[in-house]
Amino acid sequence: MPRTQRNDNFIDKSFTVMADIILKILPTNQKAKEAFVYYRDGMSAQADGEYAEALDNYEEALRLEENPNDRSYILYNMALIHASNGDHEKALGLYQEAIELNPKMPSALNNIAVIYHFQGEKAKEAGQEDDAENLFDKAAEYWKQAIRLAPNNYIEAQNWLKITGRSEMDVFF
C-alpha cells in the first residue's frame, strides 16, 4: 500500500489531500505528478525514520523528475539521510549534485560545511593538524557561500568564521 494511503494523523492526511488537489489542478504532465507522489512519500517515510523506504521513493522520484530545481531537492533529501547515517562521502556527493542543479541552495552549502567541519574536528583529534586545517578551510568556503545567499542565517557559522579568522568583513554585509 502506498505511504500516502497509510497516513494516520490529521496533519499528514490534510497535507496529502491538499497535495492531491494541487496535483489535479496544476498543468503538469503525468510523469511530473508521479515524481511528486514518490517525493511526497519519501518525505513522509523520512519524517517517520524509515530511511530505506525514503531512499527508495527518492530514487524513483529522481528517475521520473525532469525539472532541475525539483531534482535538486530530491538529491538534498537523499543527502540528509546519508549524512544522518554517517555516510558523509555519499552525502557530500549528493549535496554537490544538488548545488550543480540549484546553486542558490544555502542549506546544502551549509550542510557541506558542517560535514567538512566535523571531519576537521576528527582529524584534529587524531593529531592530523594539516588535514584538519584543510578541512576547516573547506568548511569556511562553503559557509561563506551559504551566508552570502542567506545572510541572516547560520549565526554560529558566522561566529566561527570570525573567531577563527576565516571571514572577510564583506561576507556579512
Swiss-Prot record:
Membrane topology category: Peripheral membrane protein
GO cellular component, one term: plasma membrane-derived thylakoid membrane
SMART domains found in the cross-reference section: TPR
Main localisation: membrane
Pfam families named among the record's database cross-references: TPR_12 (PF13424)
The TPR repeat ranges on this chain: 35-68, 72-105, 120-153
Superkingdom to which the source organism belongs: Bacteria
One GO biological process term: photosynthesis
InterPro entries: PSI_Ycf3_assembly, TPR-like_helical_dom_sf, TPR_rpt, Ycf3/AcsC/BcsC/TPR_MFPF
SUPFAM superfamilies: TPR-like
Compartments, as annotated in UniProt: Cellular thylakoid membrane
Keywords: Membrane, Photosynthesis, Repeat, Thylakoid, TPR repeat
Disulfide bonds: none
NCBIfam families: PRK02603.1 (NF002725)
Family assignment from sequence similarity: Belongs to the Ycf3 family.
Physiological role: Essential for the assembly of the photosystem I (PSI) complex. May act as a chaperone-like factor to guide the assembly of the PSI subunits.
Name of the protein: Photosystem I assembly protein Ycf3
Gene this protein is translated from: ycf3
